[in-house]
């Protein structure tokens, strides 16, 4: 069969395992070199396609590509750049098709979250209208775990493991010092609309009274009086209180506790730090000495503590994306399907992008305790397998060894395009 080229791009916030998906895509393409010629990657995501800034991944060694599996962040560069509505910004989509046509790219693998799924779907639709034979596959990725259809999202399991571990270790620290020093510790985690990462912090507690004593979810309206009462109860009973709070914690009217008033490139509200906001409330209302921390980029970059389950799944969806494309399944996403909890078993199936794009999966109410401050056993059964297993990177000079890519650029064939 005729050879055609493939294009891969990373989108949005990166994770500890998105490069494992890249590894899965690239290695699968190399195994099918009778049908796929060169593999190009967009420098800084979809912007690389629009500006024709392409990296020739085919020139990277097998060893360098294999090292992507244990390298965090986005090896080819990512971006927060959302292609707008196709009717009013058609030129951007047409530009993508022009670049793909110029470089004989027939396979488009877009690795990202919900917004990326929407872009992938639109590109697929426009290429069909323009008569260009393009197969577009979305490769799932998001630490927020809010993609629908898939049982869980690659990237989440490793963040969950990091947050659960950090909560456990910080709790021991606070417990050691609470008699004469800090009484309250607040850990802020990612999760704008969905509280999956905050929920993972609850895995640190194995029995009644174990920290974290409060988990604050975006799905539960923030009640200041109720929160303060629970904090005070915990300090009186245990001597200290550990709180895991989602960055998206909000009041009943939908206002974020830490709304900065700004928006990002995707139109999402930018949040200004719920941990110091909540800690300040506790100091004002109860007078307790506190410390707070924001996990921020650390939680999604911690490849040294990645979940093996997450690494395996991230690689598998990348690999499956290529299989779907070669099978002619256009506008699809490889989705993880859970077969059983104990023993944990899973597989990867194809999901229509139309069912994924611009939809969010929130914490079910029966995953959150009735009082709103913790997780249920049902939630624990769901989360526990996702943090299982260790997949340590190789170390050199005491530090993790990461992939070093040559990133040879492809010669441009088209006129310059202004974003």
UniProtKB/Swiss-Prot annotation:
Keywords: Cytoplasm, Glycolysis, Kinase, Magnesium, Metal-binding, Transferase. The active site is at 144 (proton acceptor). It catalyses: beta-D-fructose 6-phosphate + diphosphate = beta-D-fructose 1,6-bisphosphate + phosphate + H(+). One of its GO terms (molecular function) is metal ion binding. One of its GO terms (cellular component) is cytoplasm. Its EC number is 2.7.1.90. It is an enzyme of class 2 (transferase). It is found in: Cytoplasm. Its cofactor is Mg(2+). One of its GO terms (biological process) is fructose 6-phosphate metabolic process. The record marks 115 as: Important for catalytic activity and substrate specificity. Pathway: Carbohydrate degradation; glycolysis; D-glyceraldehyde 3-phosphate and glycerone phosphate from D-glucose: step 3/4. Substrate binds at residues 142-144, 190-192, 247, 297-300. Pfam families: PFK. Non-allosteric. Diphosphate binds at residue 13. The record marks 141 as: Important for catalytic activity. The keyword Transferase applies. Its main location: cytoplasm. Belongs to the phosphofructokinase type A (PFKA) family. PPi-dependent PFK group II subfamily. Clade 'B2' sub-subfamily. Homodimer. Catalyzes the phosphorylation of D-fructose 6-phosphate, the first committing step of glycolysis. Uses inorganic phosphate (PPi) as phosphoryl donor instead of ATP like common ATP-dependent phosphofructokinases (ATP-PFKs), which renders the reaction reversible, and can thus function both in glycolysis and gluconeogenesis. Consistently, PPi-PFK can replace the enzymes of both the forward (ATP-PFK) and reverse (fructose-bisphosphatase (FBPase)) reactions. This is Pyrophosphate--fructose 6-phosphate 1-phosphotransferase. It comes from Halomonas elongata (strain ATCC 33173 / DSM 2581 / NBRC 15536 / NCIMB 2198 / 1H9). The gene is pfp.
